Each structure stands twice: as structure tokens, then as C-alpha cells.
Amino acid sequence: MEIEGTLQDDRPASPKRADDLFDYDFGLDELWQETPNMPNNGAPMQSSARDESGLGLGLDEEVKVTKKRQPVAKLDESRLLSQPGIPKLRRTAKKKLRFKGKGHEFSDAARLLNFYQLWLDDLFPRAKFADGLAIIERLGHSKRLQAMRKEWIDEEKPKVTSENHNDALQASESSGSRSDDPVVAFDGLNMADTKRSRGDIAGDHTSDAEGMHIEDTLISSRQRGLDEGLFMTEDDDAAQQPDNRGAPDDDELDALLKEQELLLMNNASA
């Protein structure tokens, strides 16, 4: 059966069958109308729209291209006061910057300039070292940086604790009480007098032993007077105190002395 099928297929087609194959009713005009009008160079359909927008003058539509520009970094107050700015400079200077001192001034200055140059290069690489220093100097005159500089200076000052403050107050009060005490003031005057007397004695070419002896005698006499005043009885104190109620004035005493002198002179003449 398969052989018969192949034999039937291998048979030549009849003329009627060939006419049926090529006899199809399909219009080529309809096919060309359905397909879009594509140009020969393969340009898209937008070319017609461009021609219409250009009003047939051959001008293409202007295409506006806007580029997003990146913000340019500037060395301003905010950048200088940020963490990579002056705070980093203060923090690293305490840890890394060390000076040798006397005899190494040139090397210390070079080390300081190198330290500043590395810091400024990390902060603002666009500017040179001299230009960056000029910008920082100009920014240093602003009120914001002046206030921050004052705050940094106050932070570096030694802080006064409450205990130290109380000790200072007690010391000032004790010094004031000593100056107000009449006994202490009197002793200070006496010591000044004794020192002055010792200086005078030294000027008179006396020995130090004599000066010490005079000072001891002055101190002993003053102490003896104080002891006698302290241990004096009430009767002696009352006897030494004059009666102010019956005491004459100074003018009356002068008059009495003059009268006494006149009487003596008269008696002598007689």
C-alpha cells in the first residue's frame, strides 16, 4: 500500500490541477494599499511629522538637551566648620604634632607647614596651599568663625571646680580677716619697725648680733608691757585712770604754769 501511495504521488500533475494552483483571485493593488509607505532608506514614519513641522522647508525640529551639572565644591564656612575641617585639625594636632623645641626651630616650622598642607589637601584638593590659606584667612573675619574661635579658646582654659572655688574663697576670707584684726596689724607694724631699726643699725656699721639683741629687747619690753596691762588689778587701773570730770583743760594748765613762773621770778628778784 505504501508503494502504491508513493507511485501515485510521483505521477505528473494533470493540466487541470496546475491551472487550479495558479488560478487564485487576489488583487495586488489591495496588497500595496494595505502596506505603509516606507522610504527606501528605512527611515521611520517620524520623517513625515518633521516635514510637516518644518513646513516643507527642510528644517529639522530643534532638540533641547539639558545636562545636569554637578554642584561645585566650595571652601566656605560650613565646609571649614565640618568634621573634616578645623575639628579634625584640632583633634589630630593633639595626637600627631610634636615639636623638638629649642635648637630645632627650622625643623619644627617645616613639620608644622607640612601638617597644615596635608590637612588642607584633604579638605579642599582643588586649591593650592597658598590660595587655600588666603581663603581661610578671609573666612576667619566672619562673625561665625570668630564666635567658634572664642568657644574653642574657652574649652582649652582650665576649668575651675567647686572645690577649688571654695578653697579660693576661704583663702581670701582668711587673708581679709588677718588684715582686719588689730592685733595682727599691730604685730605687723612692730615687725616692720624692728626691720627698719635693724636696717638703720646695719647702716651704722653695727653687727648682726647687736641688731638681734635690740630686737629681742624690744620684743621683751613690749611683752612685759602687755603682761602688766593684762594682770593689773582694778585698784591700780582706777588709780592710773585720771578723773576726767575734775581735770583742767590744756589752756588752764598753761595759765597756771605761767603764773607759777611769774611768782618764782618775783621771789628771785626780791
UniProtKB/Swiss-Prot annotation:
Gene Ontology biological process terms, A to Z: DNA repair; DNA replication checkpoint signaling; meiotic cell cycle; replication fork arrest; replication fork processing
Ranges where the record places region Disordered: 1-20, 33-61, 156-185, 195-214, 223-253
Biased composition (Basic and acidic residues): 8-20, 156-166
Gene Ontology CC terms, in alphabetical order: replication fork protection complex
Keyword DNA damage: yes
Entry keyword set: Cell cycle, DNA damage, DNA repair, DNA replication inhibitor, Meiosis, Nucleus
Biased composition (Polar residues): 34-48, 167-177
Record localization: Nucleus
Superkingdom as given in the UniProt entry: Eukaryota
One example GO MF annotation: DNA binding
Subunit structure: Component of the fork protection complex (FPC) consisting of tof1 and csm3.
Function according to Swiss-Prot or TrEMBL: Forms a fork protection complex (FPC) with tof1 and which is required for chromosome segregation during meiosis and DNA damage repair. FPC coordinates leading and lagging strand synthesis and moves with the replication fork. FPC stabilizes replication forks in a configuration that is recognized by replication checkpoint sensors.
Family: Belongs to the CSM3 family.
PANTHER family in the cross-refs: TIMELESS INTERACTING-RELATED (PTHR13220), TIMELESS-INTERACTING PROTEIN (PTHR13220:SF11)
Protein name per Swiss-Prot or TrEMBL: Chromosome segregation in meiosis protein 3
